[in-house]
Structures are given as C-alpha cells and as structure tokens.
A protein has these predicted regions:
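Conserved S-adenosyl-L-methionine
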Residues: 12-21, 112
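Conserved glycine-rich Rossmann-like NAD(P)H-binding loop of the short-chain dehydrogenase/reductase
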Residues: 17-34
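Conserved residues in the N-terminal Rossmann fold of short-chain dehydrogenase/reductase
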Residues: 26, 54-55, 95
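Residues in the short beta-alpha loop(s) of Rossmann-like NAD(P)-binding domains
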Residues: 28, 38, 122
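Conserved Rossmann-fold cofactor-binding substructure of NAD(P)-dependent oxidoreductases
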Residues: 37, 46-73
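Conserved Rossmann-fold NAD(P)-dependent oxidoreductase catalytic core, especially the SDR/UDP-sugar
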Residues: 73-76, 80-140, 144, 156
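NAD(P)-dependent short-chain dehydrogenase/reductase
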Residues: 130, 136-206
C-alpha cells in the first residue's frame, strides 16, 4: 500500500530485487500519485516498469481478486489503526480490519497465491481496545486460512510488530512536533506504560 510500511517495502524490493510485477493496492489516489512521483525521482524508468498501481479497498473482494491475478506473494498491511477513531467508529474498524482480512484470504485462495503475510500488532495480544480486538480476529482469520488452502497450497502467516518509530500516526512524530514548538513536557497515556519499538527498516527486513 501507500502507508509508511508499504512505501519503504516497495523501495526495498526495487533496490534489492528485480520483480516481474510489483503491485500497490490502496484506496488513496493522492498517496498513490505522490508515491509514483517519489519513486520516479529515486529509480530509473526501467526499474519501475514492473510497477502497477491499483485503486481499491480491502472491503471490495471483487476488486481485490482482480488485483491479485497472477500474483505469487501478498503482503497485507491495510488497517484502521488509530485507537480513539476505532472506539468512536467501531463498525468501520470491523469492516476494514476483520471483513477486509476475510476478503484478502478469499481473494488469495481464488487466485492461488503462493504466500500471504499479514502485518499485525502487539496490541492483538490480550487486547484491551477495539483496534487490538479486531487485529486479533484478523490474525486468527489468516492462521485458520491454512486449513482452507487444500491442494492450492497457499501459506498464510502473521507477523506482529511493536510500535514502528516514525510511522504514520505513531507518537514519535508527535513528540518531534511538540519539541520543535518548545514544549516543556511530552504527553504520555500512563507513566506506568511500556512500549516496544522497532524501526521501519527492521519491520521491512523482518
């Protein structure tokens, strides 16, 4: 996709490999346009010949299935991840994070995709909010899909990250903005909390 992970992942693949086809599937046309412009500055036209950009939403199984034709590997990174927004809009979070995961599974099976990796979060472990609960349900959907692949042989896996430093919506950019404005204090939810951090590069390399 066109999020923090998706952009870095695409850049890494283009740098390290020569894929026959590399598809970006996301619902934000502006971010896709900006990503295309950014890639054009970083890579030569020959390297970018493999790139395809599909507008679509994981809620739309038919569009997903169309995008996955002839695809060997799928990385599923789409999610609504802002905790307060999820609590205020529970049905939207459920539709994207749970039903979207089910749509990805079915589209992958229909197209005989070889390998599927779903990105998840440590908040899915003993969840205390709706976001974590939806990601737990999503994780179980992907793991259980291994029982459905049959002779197709599609393998489904889930990787749970901690907080990714600098990703969209993470606390690091907020702290940077506040610090630049001369804030005397940085807000935290609870002084007893513990957060686990990885860099974006660590997430991609994993």
């Amino acid at each position: 996709g066109t999020g923090s992970f998706g952009r870095r992942f695409i850049e890494t693949v283009l740098t390290r490999a020569r894929p026959r086809k590399l598809i970006v599937f996301s619902r934000d046309e502006l971010k896709q346009h900006e990503m295309q412009l950014d890639l054009a500055e970083r890579f030569d036209p020959e390297t970018l010949r493999c790139m395809r950009f599909f507008l679509g939403d994981v809620r739309d199984r038919e569009r997903l299935s169309l995008a996955m034709r002839g695809v060997d590997i799928v990385i599923h990174a789409a999610a609504l991840k802002q905790v307060p927004a999820a609590e205020y809009n529970p049905s939207e979070c459920i539709h994207t994070n749970i039903m979207g995961a089910e749509n990805v599974v079915r589209a992958c099976l229909a197209n005989q995709v070889r390998q599927v990796i779903a990105l998840s979060t440590d908040k899915a472990c003993n969840p205390v909010n709706l976001y974590g609960a939806t990601k737990l349900a999503s994780d179980k959907t992907f793991v259980a899909a291994n029982n459905l692949s049959g002779d197709i042989g599609t393998r489904f896996a889930v990787v749970r990250y901690g907080n990714v430093v600098g990703s969209r919506g993470s606390v690091a950019p907020l702290f940077q903005r506040l610090s630049a404005r001369g804030a005397a204090e940085l807000p935290i939810t609870d002084e007893r909390m513990t957060r686990f951090w990885i860099t974006l590069n660590q997430g991609v390399d994993f």
